[in-house]
């Protein structure tokens, strides 16, 4: 009888990536098949996020529901991973004894052994260590699920912003070898992937080893990824302003595969608050980066993160944030009311901004950015946009839908063979959350660049260094 696995994922795109790898790994080692119904599962996994307030309480609330399932089926295995698991460790089992497996973001590759341990000994296992890059060497080959794919290039963060738990839950920055990344992307391209999104907590800090012992910078990696035949669109997230160097900006100038859209978190427009956050840059320095980016790529759109109501934030601080929003003309944002995270320096600061004031400020900021986004959408009417067709439209199954470089959904009339390919459309109308387009040309009529085939990358000879890290050599 087929064993079934249910995974509940909370949090960022990195968590989504990790969960997909867990599913592939356990399918290859134990034959687990995914199910959306927890009651059907033989194994329940919760991949957690600790960025937002009350993350732990959400975890224990769901575990309370899963406990009832385990009472009905004592053979059911329950595992908790991700950042809350990394933070809580053994304490998590003290509050929820029904949990059998506790693993951190860097130890998900050990899940098969942990599950075998539970099945063989009927005793729990906890592994929240930080074994650096080992996780990537033990995960199964990538599997494409449509024309877009996420690829993790690094883990962790060294910045220790005062509000953030990432360095404590995912560890410090560790970069994957560049050849491993290119090999994975070439495999995905061979399966029909056309767009890759490079993932990391701080991708522009990437410094990966090459097969000849050199170091590959993030700018170099972007060019190498863009050169793989079949990969015609490259994205990345997330970046830190202090490492957004000129060589990365130069890639925007000469590499058309890199999209005209950038998510660059700033958090606040107030230099005083930025200092308290330990962001290590000013609002003016942030704007200087954006100015240079727009010189290199005039049509680039910018999104960002904002924390509203950070301890000590005054009305003047908030007004400076709103000035930055207008000056940069952000297209979209992930904006939240500040919530203290246990163990971070900011958690010890007096939170002297009222909840009502925080909510009001957040509403003002989100309303302004929504207004700017609509203005940008209206400016796209009459322009020609290249979109990657992802499938049928959610609004009309007789139509297709795809995304522009700046992440707008475009609905248009087309034929099924266009799915997974690029088309050029003219934007003719704007709606609240999408655009309307008219087909102008298909991929067969485009002059897409070809540099290196996926097969030529895959054909490289694999060698392993003394640490067992795979290297690929021509």
From Swiss-Prot:
What does the record's cofactor remark say about binding? Answer: Binds 2 [4Fe-4S] clusters. One cluster is coordinated with 3 cysteines and an exchangeable S-adenosyl-L-methionine.
Q: Where is the Radical SAM core domain?
A: 143-375
Domain MTTase N-terminal positions? 3-120
Is Lipoprotein a UniProt keyword of this protein?
Answer: no
The family note in this entry says: Belongs to the methylthiotransferase family. MiaB subfamily.
The record's catalysed reaction(s) read: N(6)-dimethylallyladenosine(37) in tRNA + (sulfur carrier)-SH + AH2 + 2 S-adenosyl-L-methionine = 2-methylsulfanyl-N(6)-dimethylallyladenosine(37) in tRNA + (sulfur carrier)-H + 5'-deoxyadenosine + L-methionine + A + S-adenosyl-L-homocysteine + 2 H(+)
Return the NCBIfam families for the record.
miaB-methiolase, MiaB/RimO family radical SAM methylthiotransferase
One GO CC annotation:
cytosol
Supply the SUPFAM superfamilies for this chain. Answer: Radical SAM enzymes
User: Under what name is this protein listed?
Assistant: tRNA-2-methylthio-N(6)-dimethylallyladenosine synthase
Q: Which InterPro entries match?
A: Elp3/MiaA/NifB-like_rSAM (IPR006638), Methylthiotransferase (IPR005839), Methylthiotransferase_CS (IPR020612), Methylthiotransferase_N (IPR013848), Methylthiotransferase_N_sf (IPR038135), MiaB_methiolase (IPR006463), rSAM (IPR007197), rSAM_horseshoe (IPR023404)
Where does the protein end up? Cytoplasm
- Write the Enzyme Commission number(s) for this entry: 2.8.4.3
User: What does this chain do?
Assistant: Catalyzes the methylthiolation of N6-(dimethylallyl)adenosine (i(6)A), leading to the formation of 2-methylthio-N6-(dimethylallyl)adenosine (ms(2)i(6)A) at position 37 in tRNAs that read codons beginning with uridine.
The TRAM domain covers 378-441
- Name the positions where [4Fe-4S] cluster 1 binds: 12, 49, 83
Q: Specify whether Transferase is a keyword of the entry.
A: yes
Query: Sorted alphabetically, which keywords does the UniProt record give?
Result: 4Fe-4S, Cytoplasm, Iron, Iron-sulfur, Metal-binding, S-adenosyl-L-methionine, Transferase, tRNA processing
Q: Which cofactor does it need?
A: [4Fe-4S] cluster
């Amino acid at each position: 009888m087929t064993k079934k696995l249910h995974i509940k994922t909370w949090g960022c795109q990195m968590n989504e990536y990790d969960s997909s790898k867990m599913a592939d790994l356990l399918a290859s080692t134990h034959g687990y098949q995914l199910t959306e119904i927890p009651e059907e599962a033989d194994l329940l996994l919760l991949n957690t996020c600790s960025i937002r307030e009350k993350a732990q309480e959400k975890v224990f609330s769901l575990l309370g529901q899963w406990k009832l399932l385990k009472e009905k089926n004592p053979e059911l295995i329950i595992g908790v991973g991700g950042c809350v698991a990394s933070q809580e460790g053994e304490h998590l089992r003290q509050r929820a004894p029904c949990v059998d497996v506790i693993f951190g973001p860097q130890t998900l590759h050990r899940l098969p052994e942990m599950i075998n341990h539970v099945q063989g000994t009927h005793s729990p296992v906890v592994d929240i260590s930080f074994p650096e890059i080992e996780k990537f060497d033990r995960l199964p080959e990538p599997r494409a699920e449509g024309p877009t794919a996420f690829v993790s290039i690094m883990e962790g963060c060294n910045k220790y912003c005062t509000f953030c738990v990432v360095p404590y839950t995912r560890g410090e920055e560790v970069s994957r070898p560049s050849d491993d990344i290119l090999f994975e992307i070439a495999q995905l391209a061979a399966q029909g992937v056309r767009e890759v999104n490079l993932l990391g907590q701080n991708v522009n800090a990437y410094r990966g080893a090459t097969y000849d012992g050199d170091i590959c910078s993030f700018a170099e990696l972007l060019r190498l990824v863009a050169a793989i035949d079949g990969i015609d669109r490259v994205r990345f997230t997330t970046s830190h302003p202090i490492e957004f160097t000129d060589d990365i900006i130069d890639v925007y100038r000469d590499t058309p595969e890199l999209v005209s859209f950038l998510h660059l978190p700033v958090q606040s427009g107030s230099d005083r608050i930025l200092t308290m956050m330990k962001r290590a840059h000013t609002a003016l320095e942030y704007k200087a980066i954006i100015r240079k980016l727009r010189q290199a790529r005039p049509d680039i759109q910018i999104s960002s993160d904002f924390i509203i109501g950070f301890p000590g934030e005054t009305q003047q601080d908030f007004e400076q944030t709103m000035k930055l929003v207008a000056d940069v003309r952000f297209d979209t944002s992930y904006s939240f009311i500040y919530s203290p995270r246990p163990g971070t320096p900011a958690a010890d600061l007096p939170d002297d901004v009222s909840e009502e004031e925080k909510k009001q400020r957040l509403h003002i900021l989100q309303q302004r950015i929504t207004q700017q986004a609509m203005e940008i959408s209206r400016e796209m009417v009459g322009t020609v946009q290249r979109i990657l067709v992802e499938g049928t439209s959610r609004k009309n199954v007789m139509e297709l839908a795809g995304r522009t470089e700046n992440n707008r959904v475009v609905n248009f009339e087309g034929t099924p063979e266009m799915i997974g390919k690029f088309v050029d459309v003219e934007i003719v109308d704007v709606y609240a959350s999408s655009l309307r387009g008219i087909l102008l040309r298909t991929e067969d009529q485009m002059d897409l660049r070809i540099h290196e085939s996926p097969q030529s990358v895959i054909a490289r000879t694999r060698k392993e260094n003394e640490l067992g890290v795979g290297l690929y050599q021509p």
